[in-house]
Amino acid sequence: MRQERVAFERSLAARLVASGRLDEAAAERALRLRAGSEERLEQILTKLGLVHEKDVAEAMSSELGVPMALPSDFPDEPVLESASPKFLRQAQVLPLRDLPDRLLLAVADPLNKYPVQSLALLAGKPVEIRIATPSDVELAHERLYGGEKGAFGRIVDEIEQADDMGPDDDIDRLRDLASEEPVIRLVNLLIARAVESRASDIHIEPFQDRLAVRYRIDGVLREGALPPARLRAAVVSRIKIMAKLNIAERRLPQDGRIRIAIRGRDYDLRVATVPTLHGEGVTMRILDRSSLVEDFGVLGFRPDTLKRYLDLLDQPQGILLVTGPTGSGKTTTLYTSLLRLNTPEKKIFTVEDPIEYQLDGVNQVQVKPQIKLTFAEILRTLLRHNPDIIMVGEMRDFETAQVAIQAALTGHLVLSTLHTNNAAGSINRLLDMKVDDYLVTSTVNGVMAQRLVRRLCEQCRKPRQALPELIERMGLRPLMNGRDTTLYDAVGCDACHSTGYRGQMAVIEVLALSDAIRRLVLNHAEVREIQRVAMEEGMRTMYQDGLLKALDGSTTVEEVLRVTRDV
């Protein structure tokens, strides 16, 4: 068995090198470490951050000719209940399906025959294996067999029972601790729980006597598991190793990225650290490339609003602005727009800080202020590369606005964002940047403003009839058009974690620059006057769009008021 494993691990390392997932020197280093260790090669590779778990699992699958476990293979209820959860957990296996003629089993170590033979004996039938990552197996155990403590508590116990962790300023000891299996599993589990909860961000915050973990779900922060305070340095160090950051540098903020697979699906995590009074804090933004779809309806566009927006998006040249505060979904709207525009006939560039999603067929450029590679500098360069469409992550200053306007005047379509309260306010923001009014009216085709409201959970939302005084006070009557006066309240159930909401959608207003609005801009009219004329020309405000969504039962009036109160 030992010789079989050694031969397999050498073949596995060679396959990873041949596929470009591992360089040859790193492979030799890992094999040398393996010779004097009880750990498997795949454990060493992932522990050192040399290869992602999913890459190792896929290489094992190819090497052995054994299929990978698909996300749909993992059960919702325990399979083969006569099997001991403790045995399954220690063996890193999980029964997937009990079929009439065989047992389907997920395994993290396909060369370990003992649990396969034991379960075949217990089930009284042959076992067919599927390869899965250790994290996916552990997450499934947590979900199916959590018990009183669950996987999180057991991992913490393992770490607590280990040797003394040493002081937080012992970098070599921290590096070793962060590379030990229990800490790796703990951090992977924190990330996996966030993904399972549909979180957009993970916040790890050190305080004097505790380490807080919070997840932002549907725009609202919620408490997660609480690791012991003494683990804060180990947890942060593990994240920094995964993000390829310098674990010895704790005085300065650092930025990095992690790629991780959860239940067979790839996620990118944008990692930012910050030094605080009680240690380093970490924020991780979870980016799911597969969540980007060319479906504006999913984002919250109503058909008539979508038509107004697409009329602007399909213009051959000019500037289209998407505006709203941080976290209002502007970037998602722009990426969805690029998916629609991305055809073989068009050359598209983006200028971003940072690049959030990688888009095939789109040339994406990262801003690097430390070497003076700014938005404006990149834009000037791109104009020499014959683009059709340019997306600028943010029009944050006069210089960037000036070059964007030059691009629009020379026949390019420019998409960008601004931070303003509403669509009409974006025009005045450009004027405040000292952009000439005639250039604004000559280049800006339109502005879309948006905010995010939480979607009502369809499993537990509760209908009620709106009182006449509420209809008048909220301005609902002009929007009803024969609708009944049913509104819905958030209640809370297991499906939505007792919040009453599940998911988010945008409330939107689209302002097209008509001749009348251009005249107002040239006369430096106030924002209220521009908004009034835009509404007369058919623009529906974010507040009105939100009320329609409340009447549809998609959200609540309270949510609409929460996000539109300042517009």
Locate each region found by the language model.
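Short, flexible helix-loop junctions that flank or precede catalytic/ligand sites
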Residues: 176-193, 197-567
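N-terminal, intrinsically disordered, highly charged
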Residues: 1-280, 285-292, 296-297, 303-305, ...
